[in-house]
Amino acid sequence: MSKLVAPHGGKGLVCCLLEGKALEDEKKKAAGLKQIEISSRAKGDLIMMGIGGFSPLNGFMNKADWKSVCEKMTLTDGTFWPVPVTLDVSAAEAKSIKAGEEVALVRKGEVMATMKVEEIYEMTEADKKMECELVFKGEGPDSEKFWEVAPEDHPGVKMVLAQKEYNIAGPVKVLSQGEFPEKFPGVYMTPAQLRAKMDERGWQKVAALQLRNPMHRSHEYLAKIGVEVCDGVVIHSLVGSLKPGDIPAEVRVKCIDTLVDKYFVKDFVIQAGYPLDMRYAGPREALLHATFRQNYGINNLLVGRDHAGVGDFYGMFEAQEIFRKMPTPADSGKRLLCEPLNIDWTFYCKKCDGMASMRTCPHGKEDRVILSGTKLRKMLSEGADVPDHFGRDEVLAILREYYSGLTEKVEVKMQRAASGSTM
């Protein structure tokens, strides 16, 4: 019998992905349905509903659930849920759909799911603004200052404001996991697959390290703290879409493979990937990270400095603080059971000659080097020398190769532009 934490919501893994004859029959039916083109984010959400990663959700939220999640961080039935999971459509599409109708949800020519539309509701500019304030603003600037910069500088806010005029809600039948199983074999895992792997190892107390950047020395330090205090650590990478300028998942996965192979005891670490896009929701997104990690069988989330941060919008430890403020339903099945493992500031200390934290290092600021993915990307993109304490040599070599390839592509484009060639 598994010793792992139960899935969120008290209903086991709620998986909307069809298989076998049911899948073939639904695909045939989908061919005759009205098609709705969906975003990359919605595609990731659908796959998570398909594989049970978003348990207990079985479809996109209606307006009552959307409002309750924004205001209270719970669904209307009292189950904890930190961010809206909605599907937007244009006014013309909304007008063409009737409640009770089934539609096919399509992403770039691939039918991802069918959906029974139970509700169609308008999202006014005031509704979108409310979602941004409650979900994305955090505890930082006041509303006036937030709105001075967020529409241009906050990627999560920009996405919400750019959404179409209506949302549609209802249960889904998922027909595909997209490109992820083939693109990331052995890394992309469903909750059931990861749970089986951890059960084989007899794990019970498991920590996850959330990653959207290449794994630098601070990440390695956090992961090894998790190894020390838990049965094992899952290095869990986002393999969906990020913002322009971020490093592709294929490169990040290769970096982690190399790091795990050379610097970890393999019995105590698993590399895995999940199919979501970043929402850039700051502290609320940290809660989402914990929520779906519970579905993967993980009961601790490593939360360090500026977890899921966006620029300067959030306090350095606001993502840790929100776990103390979230609602705790009386029913344990509806409560979030994945707890944070809070880690203080981490850095490379020149005097300690190694990674340290505010709790372990007595030295001053002049001896401390804060490591971040943003700094690392900047140095690599500019071709600057990267100090050894930022990353392992083997990882930096992979990243340099990637950025070298980008430089070559830019130079080729410039040469073609100068010569007038479009080939």
Curated annotation (Swiss-Prot):
<dbReference type="InterPro" id="IPR002650">
    <property type="entry name" value="Sulphate_adenylyltransferase"/>
</dbReference>
<dbReference type="GO" id="GO:0005524">
    <property type="term" value="F:ATP binding"/>
</dbReference>
<dbReference type="InterPro" id="IPR020792">
    <property type="entry name" value="SO4_adenylyltransferase_pro"/>
</dbReference>
<dbReference type="InterPro" id="IPR024951">
    <property type="entry name" value="Sulfurylase_cat_dom"/>
</dbReference>
<keyword id="KW-0547">Nucleotide-binding</keyword>
<dbReference type="InterPro" id="IPR015947">
    <property type="entry name" value="PUA-like_sf"/>
</dbReference>
<dbReference type="InterPro" id="IPR025980">
    <property type="entry name" value="ATP-Sase_PUA-like_dom"/>
</dbReference>
<dbReference type="GO" id="GO:0000103">
    <property type="term" value="P:sulfate assimilation"/>
</dbReference>
<dbReference type="Pfam" id="PF14306">
    <property type="entry name" value="PUA_2"/>
</dbReference>
<comment type="similarity">
    <text>Belongs to the sulfate adenylyltransferase family.</text>
</comment>
<dbReference type="Pfam" id="PF01747">
    <property type="entry name" value="ATP-sulfurylase"/>
</dbReference>
<dbReference type="GO" id="GO:0004781">
    <property type="term" value="F:sulfate adenylyltransferase (ATP) activity"/>
</dbReference>
<keyword id="KW-0067">ATP-binding</keyword>
<keyword id="KW-0808">Transferase</keyword>
<comment type="pathway">
    <text>Sulfur metabolism; hydrogen sulfide biosynthesis; sulfite from sulfate: step 1/3.</text>
</comment>
<keyword id="KW-0548">Nucleotidyltransferase</keyword>
<protein>
    <recommendedName>
        <fullName>Sulfate adenylyltransferase</fullName>
        <ecNumber>2.7.7.4</ecNumber>
    </recommendedName>
</protein>
<dbReference type="GO" id="GO:0070814">
    <property type="term" value="P:hydrogen sulfide biosynthetic process"/>
</dbReference>
<dbReference type="InterPro" id="IPR014729">
    <property type="entry name" value="Rossmann-like_a/b/a_fold"/>
</dbReference>
